[in-house]
Swiss-Prot record:
GO molecular function list: hormone activity; protein-containing complex binding
GO terms for cellular component: extracellular region; extracellular space
Gene: ADM2
Residues annotated as site: Required for CALCRL receptor interaction: 107, 114, 119
Native organism taxonomy: Eukaryota, Metazoa, Chordata, Craniata, Vertebrata
Protein name: Protein ADM2
GO annotation (BP), single: regulation of systemic arterial blood pressure
Tissue-level expression: Expressed in the esophagus, stomach, jejunum, ileum, ileocecum, ascending colon, transverse colon, descending colon and rectum. Expressed in myocardial cells of the heart, renal tubular cells, hypothalamus, and pituitary.
Amino acid sequence: MARIPTAALGCISLLCLQLPGSLSRSLGGDPRPVKPREPPARSPSSSLQPRHPAPRPVVWKLHRALQAQRGAGLAPVMGQPLRDGGRQHSGPRRHSGPRRTQAQLLRVGCVLGTCQVQNLSHRLWQLMGPAGRQDSAPVDPSSPHSYG
């Protein structure tokens, strides 16, 4: 359910990138059409670090506009530090290990269904030994529960 707002924000940002003048007009900006910018010429001697800091993307402007409409006191704006330093609880921390918000399974090895069946079968064989099926009933080929 949390992916729907993320997908909606992504669609809106793509739409704003396709229509560069629509965001400034909707926010009360200049009604003139915006000229598309030309990419800067690259030379082999230019360094990897940009000379000027990169401008904030259109998504940032959209986010700021939406935050202003909702009310500035309701949620912190992206990129600004939290007022309380990011701590939610003032008491001591009981567990010193890394905190996980949800229970996470540690994936080791192959995650294909056939590999999992193979691993479970091998573990059963290890637990029961090679004489594992001697105590069970023989397979009846005419039974609907058998594979025969």
